[in-house]
Amino acid sequence: MQLTSYTDYSLRLLLYLALQPKHKLSSVKQVADIYRISYNHLTKVTHELGKLGLIETIKGRNGGIRLAKEPEEINIGEVVKQTEDNLELVECFNRETNTCILNPACRLKGVLHEALAAYLQVLEQYTVKDLVLNEDDLRALLQFKTTEQ
């Protein structure tokens, strides 16, 4: 299973913001530049994470973005479920579009459902805080300036 770039960018944005001092605002452009990802795509991600209550967006000249919750309150599994638009691993997961003739007797579908549930269960064991415990390494890779720490 491959996560969409939308979910990938969502998680990366949350990690970046978790590494910031508590009330420091960051700009979407700054984050997009550091990660070398599309500003427009990251803007959409930012808007959605704001609607989900995960980040706070402040408009205006001195505005920016920051986490709206503590990093330990943001569950990775929940973020993935909220940002992935399709967790259907195979066609038969969708009753409306399923055309597979094996569906009535297929055991693979059950195995894949079980695998997806296990995947999500593992993700649900982690929060954003868990993913930034190696904060010094991450800061170095993201080239945080000493004054930002």
Swiss-Prot record:
Binds 1 [2Fe-2S] cluster per subunit. [2Fe-2S] cluster binds at C92, C100, C106. One of its GO terms (cellular component) is cytosol. Residues 28-51 bind DNA. Keywords: 2Fe-2S, DNA-binding, Iron, Iron-sulfur, Metal-binding, Transcription, Transcription regulation. Its cofactor is [2Fe-2S] cluster. InterPro entries: TR_Rrf2-type_CS (IPR030489), Tscrpt_reg_Rrf2 (IPR000944), WH-like_DNA-bd_sf (IPR036388), WH_DNA-bd_sf (IPR036390). GO terms for molecular function: 2 iron, 2 sulfur cluster binding; DNA binding; DNA-binding transcription factor activity; metal ion binding. It comes from the Bacteria. Signal peptide: none annotated. Residues 2-133 form the HTH rrf2-type domain. NCBIfam families: rrf2_super. Nitric oxide-responsive transcriptional regulator. This is HTH-type transcriptional regulator NsrR. It comes from Shouchella clausii (strain KSM-K16). The gene is nsrR.
